[in-house]
């Protein structure tokens, strides 16, 4: 299991825990922890069988994940981060249609269908949602966005 050891909070410890849990069910796995400068080119080149990878969605749109992580790797942005090689022509067709669909209800239904197929096929194995804590005084309130970027307009001081 390839794992960065200086990219995510407790990344190497998470990988150690996964390797230990898999050993309990008979899945022999060797941990290969490395600095992110080595890790990312390694997995991007497909030189891995399983790896820990984090993902954030700055667009707040599921299409970003579908297009980048799930679509079959091809040219341009399509499947650019699909390092595991997941491929399903039906999911690809849905993603291509989602890209140009303007009807919100139809688009949402297609997103749900594509994500549902991917989940049933175990295209990825989600481990956890990393929350990066922010420290502040008790009287300071701010909404913690999924992309971990503070918006000053959302800060409230009581």
Model regions and ranges:
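Short, solvent-exposed loop/beta-turn-alpha elements that line the ligand-binding surface or hinge
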Residues: 42-46, 67-96, 100, 129-158
């Amino acid at each position: 299991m390839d794992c960065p050891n200086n990219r995510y909070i407790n990344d190497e410890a998470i990988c150690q825990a996964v390797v230990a849990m898999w050993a309990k069910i008979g899945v022999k796995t060797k941990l290969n922890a490395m600095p992110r400068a080595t890790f990312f080119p390694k997995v991007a080149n497909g030189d891995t069988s399983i790896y820990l990878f984090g993902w954030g969605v700055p667009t707040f749109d599921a299409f970003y994940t579908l297009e980048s992580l799930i679509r079959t790797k091809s040219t341009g942005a399509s499947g650019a981060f699909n390092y595991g090689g997941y491929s399903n022509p039906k999911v690809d067709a849905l993603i291509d249609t989602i890209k140009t669909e303007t009807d919100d209800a139809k688009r949402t239904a297609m997103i749900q269908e594509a994500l549902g197929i991917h989940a049933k096929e175990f295209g990825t194995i989600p481990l956890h949602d990393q929350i990066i804590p922010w420290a502040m005084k008790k009287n300071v309130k701010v909404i913690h966005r999924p992309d971990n970027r503070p918006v000053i307009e959302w800060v409230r001081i009581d």
